[in-house]
UniProtKB/Swiss-Prot annotation:
Keywords: Cytoplasm. It comes from Shewanella denitrificans (strain OS217 / ATCC BAA-1090 / DSM 15013). This is Regulator of ribonuclease activity B. Globally modulates RNA abundance by binding to RNase E (Rne) and regulating its endonucleolytic activity. Can modulate Rne action in a substrate-dependent manner by altering the composition of the degradosome. Disulfide bonds: none annotated. Its main location: cytoplasm. Interacts with the C-terminal region of Rne. It comes from the Bacteria. HAMAP family: RraB.
């Protein structure tokens, strides 16, 4: 699949995820931890991608080794950013990181975050009581 098509699909997915989170009541004004996922069977290539992501201003966690269902091993890390659920920011980050993945020949596996809403605040209030 071409990079242009991958970007187009990722941008559409970004909008769907943001709309779903906000539609479910996640707080639009909160700052979110956005974790962009990378993976590769080649640790050296993955390490180069991590360095590139760091140079772009992302926090990068240590690579982890995981065993897949078929018994093969894969390495993965997250490039982390903190910002609002803003589609323009997500699109820009995804484009930058997908270019890194393409350059280093590793997989960009999308991004994830956590719901921020009333139940988190209620849990905090219960802990303080």
């Amino acid at each position: 699949m071409s990079m242009e098509r991958q970007l187009k699909e990722q941008f559409a997915e970004n909008r769907e995820i943001v709309e779903a989170l906000l539609g479910d009541g996640s707080d639009a004004d909160s700052e979110y931890v956005i974790e962009h996922h990378f993976s590769s069977t080649n640790f050296d290539k993955l390490e180069k991608a991590a360095v590139d992501a760091f140079k772009l201003g992302f926090e990068v966690n240590d690579a982890e080794e995981m065993e897949l269902e078929d018994g093969s091993e894969i390495f993965c890390f997250d490039a982390i950013a903190n910002h609002k659920l803003d589609v323009a920011l997500l699109d820009k980050a995804c484009e930058q990181l997908m270019q890194v993945a393409h350059k280093q020949k590793v997989d960009y596996d999308g991004w994830g975050t956590y719901f921020i809403g009333d139940e988190i605040e209620e849990d905090d209030e219960e802990e303080q009581a």
